[in-house]
Curated annotation (Swiss-Prot):
Keywords associated with the record: Ribonucleoprotein, Ribosomal protein
Gene label: rpmH
Note: The open reading frame (ORF) for this protein is entirely within the ORF for the RNase P protein (RnaP). The two start codons are separated by four nucleotides.
GO BP term, pick one: translation
Subunit structure: Part of the 50S ribosomal subunit.
GO CC annotation terms, alphabetical: ribonucleoprotein complex; ribosome
Family from the record: Belongs to the bacterial ribosomal protein bL34 family.
Transmembrane segments: none
Biased composition (Basic residues): 1-22, 30-42
Statement: the UniProt record of this protein carries the keyword Ribosomal protein: yes
Name of this chain's protein: Large ribosomal subunit protein bL34
């Protein structure tokens, strides 16, 4: 069976990146929550 983690930088950025988050109201809420919580990183590193 194929593993669930098949690294792909572009896919990662498109689904979890900052601009992807900013596009939707829900994504903006995620960023707001993470800012309020004081997270160092608002979005995951896109390092593949």
């Amino acid at each position: 069976m194929k593993r669930t983690w098949q690294p792909n930088r572009r896919k990662r950025a498109k689904t979890h990146g900052f601009r992807a988050r900013m596009k939707t109201p829900g994504g903006r809420n995620v960023l707001k929550r993470r800012r309020r919580k004081g997270r160092w990183r608002l979005t995951p590193k896109v390092s593949g």
